[in-house]
Amino acid sequence: MATIQLLNIKKQYDNDIFVINDLNLTVADGEFLVIVGPSGCGKSTLLRIIAGLEKVTSGELYIDNELINNREPADRDIAMVFQNYALYPHMTVRGNLEYGLKNRKTPKEDINKRIAHVAKLLEIEPFLDRKPQQLSGGQRQRVAMGRVIVRKPRVFLFDEPLSNLDAKLRAHMCIEIKKLQRSLKTTSLYVTHDQLEAMTLADKMVVMNKGTIEQIGTPMEIYDCPKTIFVADFIGSPPINFLDRQALEKHLGNLFSCSKDTDILAFRPEAILLGEYPDKGPVFHTQIEFIRPIGTGCHVLTRWNDILFTVDIKERLTSDYGQKLNFTVTHQNFHTFNKKTGNRT
């Protein structure tokens, strides 16, 4: 296990654009930290910097209080799982698992013990004599993880390891990875663009945008109290609803007080009360545009004046296009932001 510290990390390429700009981050010993953000935000570059596959332009990287900026990747005691499984196709599962250990001249008895332990842990014992092409996608991903686990590294790095799997298998593997990390207690960093993966796996979550950190916190802290418009919009499915303060006051009046800096309001799709409760908050008289059934209820696209909202209804609606849907958003369920700064007010 290990503690990781990144101090004022900058990564700049020849075009003078900072891929990562003045980033500071601490990962606690044994913590599972998930970095989430859109494509191009710098999350995979950050992982590669920690692994030693990319050099920083400036800043300091520490593992257990030891500066490792100039350490070679092989000397950092870090193991990485990639999106493509990176297995040797001509080797058996056993051969893939033992390859790195043999290169490090690990005693044969120790190799056999480690492989037996990992094969049992990952439930790949029946596949040890098979080659990768004889395995399913999920089985190959388990082998890829097994290959890094047998090394017993200080740090695990996961670079979108589940993106090649179908939705059902991805959900299952999320649970398996979380259980595995809890068992091993190895400091882990996991990169994904999938917010559901991030919220499922993370002890702590980092939301990145354009090379900087927008917010750090537990998944529920970030969901319940987004610090910026970007975080509010990026985290949550269906996405949050935004409303211009002037539009609200134009149609409904000044129903509650908020700071002068507030010009954007937002509410989560599930944070509504069906019906009219004017004593609890603004009432929206809307028309249904589209209903998306989800089994336990439905997501409804509604129109209020010229604004579209998505609301999460916990019942099966039989209404159709153009029919009325009235709901209330309580005062405490509004998030408030400043458009110019993008920050929460």
Swiss-Prot record:
<dbReference type="GO" id="GO:0008643">
    <property type="term" value="P:carbohydrate transport"/>
</dbReference>
<dbReference type="GO" id="GO:0005524">
    <property type="term" value="F:ATP binding"/>
</dbReference>
<dbReference type="GO" id="GO:0001407">
    <property type="term" value="P:glycerophosphodiester transmembrane transport"/>
</dbReference>
<dbReference type="InterPro" id="IPR027417">
    <property type="entry name" value="P-loop_NTPase"/>
</dbReference>
<comment type="similarity">
    <text>Belongs to the ABC transporter superfamily. sn-glycerol-3-phosphate importer (TC 3.A.1.1.3) family.</text>
</comment>
<dbReference type="InterPro" id="IPR003439">
    <property type="entry name" value="ABC_transporter-like_ATP-bd"/>
</dbReference>
<protein>
    <recommendedName>
        <fullName>sn-glycerol-3-phosphate import ATP-binding protein UgpC</fullName>
        <ecNumber>7.6.2.10</ecNumber>
    </recommendedName>
</protein>
<feature type="binding site">
    <location>
        <begin position="37"/>
        <end position="44"/>
    </location>
    <ligand>
        <name>ATP</name>
    </ligand>
</feature>
<keyword id="KW-0997">Cell inner membrane</keyword>
<dbReference type="InterPro" id="IPR017871">
    <property type="entry name" value="ABC_transporter-like_CS"/>
</dbReference>
<feature type="domain" description="ABC transporter">
    <location>
        <begin position="4"/>
        <end position="235"/>
    </location>
</feature>
<comment type="subunit">
    <text>The complex is composed of two ATP-binding proteins (UgpC), two transmembrane proteins (UgpA and UgpE) and a solute-binding protein (UgpB).</text>
</comment>
<comment type="function">
    <text>Part of the ABC transporter complex UgpBAEC involved in sn-glycerol-3-phosphate (G3P) import. Responsible for energy coupling to the transport system.</text>
</comment>
<dbReference type="GO" id="GO:0015430">
    <property type="term" value="F:ABC-type glycerol-3-phosphate transporter activity"/>
</dbReference>
<dbReference type="InterPro" id="IPR015855">
    <property type="entry name" value="ABC_transpr_MalK-like"/>
</dbReference>
<dbReference type="GO" id="GO:0016887">
    <property type="term" value="F:ATP hydrolysis activity"/>
</dbReference>
<keyword id="KW-0067">ATP-binding</keyword>
<keyword id="KW-1003">Cell membrane</keyword>
<keyword id="KW-0547">Nucleotide-binding</keyword>
<keyword id="KW-0813">Transport</keyword>
<dbReference type="Pfam" id="PF00005">
    <property type="entry name" value="ABC_tran"/>
</dbReference>
<dbReference type="InterPro" id="IPR008995">
    <property type="entry name" value="Mo/tungstate-bd_C_term_dom"/>
</dbReference>
<dbReference type="InterPro" id="IPR047641">
    <property type="entry name" value="ABC_transpr_MalK/UgpC-like"/>
</dbReference>
<keyword id="KW-0472">Membrane</keyword>
<dbReference type="InterPro" id="IPR012340">
    <property type="entry name" value="NA-bd_OB-fold"/>
</dbReference>
<keyword id="KW-0762">Sugar transport</keyword>
<dbReference type="GO" id="GO:0055052">
    <property type="term" value="C:ATP-binding cassette (ABC) transporter complex, substrate-binding subunit-containing"/>
</dbReference>
<keyword id="KW-1278">Translocase</keyword>
<dbReference type="InterPro" id="IPR003593">
    <property type="entry name" value="AAA+_ATPase"/>
</dbReference>
